Swiss-Prot record:
One of its GO terms (molecular function) is tRNA pseudouridine(38-40) synthase activity. The keyword Membrane does not apply. Substrate binds at Y124. It comes from Streptomyces coelicolor (strain ATCC BAA-471 / A3(2) / M145). Its EC number is 5.4.99.12. The keyword tRNA processing applies. Homodimer. This is tRNA pseudouridine synthase A. The active site is at D63 (nucleophile).
Length: 284
């Protein structure tokens, strides 16, 4: 599948963040629902005085209610539009976009760059507190309250059994034709001085609901309802377990997206498009 930029166009990388509380996710939807993609595309069309809407491609298609601090997207703009507007485009977008979404940087992307397929990892953070009094009101839109005491050491022990390349079908919402094979590079939890437990989750990519399902399983371990070996057993079974809850979205933030060196972007782009299969697993 080719990803060549059309002649006469320039590919532009956008670095952005948003509070997902009032959005129905990243991706545009029918029925006029408010989405991050829709807001940015509308703003781009307005500030460049274009008749056409230029479609964004994003690194991580976040669900409704999920936040992003380090999201990355790209858009292909006509070269004359970019030449005319690039100097003042960032400031004009700041004046046009709603306050819950910001574009922090705009620059011409290097050859071979694709915000989605060139990425080598995405890093999310999920924040939860077991404070008996609940969540700080100033943080309530970004931290989950769990009303059982959490054993972070037990949660980390459970997390270690999930690392590596696996078929995460047991932790993903099934989508027709989509692979559930992923490489979980990091899954660790730390309790801060404020009592908030932050889970760091990093992988080459994530399937639908994967992060929130993993956190749901670890919370069951942390509060003593299951042993540290349970999440790995669920993974090995390969089917959804009714005891694994998909935790609420507001505790989840996309923190950062990683890319290789410029000279490796095109190769990574091509590699990521190849559907994965585990060694020994049946194909198709």
């Amino acid at each position: 599948m080719s990803d060549e930029v059309e002649a006469g166009f320039v590919r532009v990388r956008l670095d952005l963040s948003y509070d997902g509380s009032e959005f129905s996710g990243w991706a545009k939807q029918a029925g006029g629902r408010r989405t991050v993609q829709g807001e940015i595309e509308d703003a781009l069309r307005t500030v460049t005085r274009s008749r056409e809407t230029y479609e964004l491609t994003v690194a991580g298609r976040t669900d409704a209610g999920v936040h992003a601090r380090g999201q990355v997207a790209h858009v292909d703009l006509p070269r004359e539009v970019w030449a005319e507007h690039h100097v003042k485009l960032l400031k004009r977008l700041a004046g046009r976009l709603p306050r819950d979404v910001r574009v922090w940087a705009l620059r011409e992307a290097p050859s071979g760059f694709n915000a989605r397929f060139s990425a080598v990892w995405r890093r999310y953070a999920y924040r939860v507190t077991d404070n008996p009094g609940g969540v700080d009101p100033l943080l309530r839109g970004h931290v989950l309250w769990h009303d059982w005491p959490l054993d972070v050491d037990a949660m980390n022990a459970a997390a270690r059994g999930l690392l590596g390349e696996h078929d995460f079908a047991a932790y993903c919402k099934k989508r027709e034709g989509a692979t559930t094979i992923r490489t979980l590079q990091e899954l660790s939890l730390v309790r801060g001085e404020d009592g908030i437990v932050t889970a760091t989750v990093r992988a080459d990519a994530f399937c639908h609901n994967m992060v929130r399902s993993l956190i749901g399983a670890l919370l069951f371990v942390g509060d003593g309802h299951r042993g540290p070996e349970w999440p790995a057993k669920v993974l090995a079974a390969g089917v959804r377990d009714s005891a694994v809850h998909v935790v609420r979205p507001h505790g989840l933030t996309l923190e950062e997206v990683g890319y290789p060196a410029d000279e490796l972007l095109a190769a990574r782009n091509k590699e990521a498009r190849n559907k994965r299969s585990l060694p020994g697993a049946g194909c198709c």
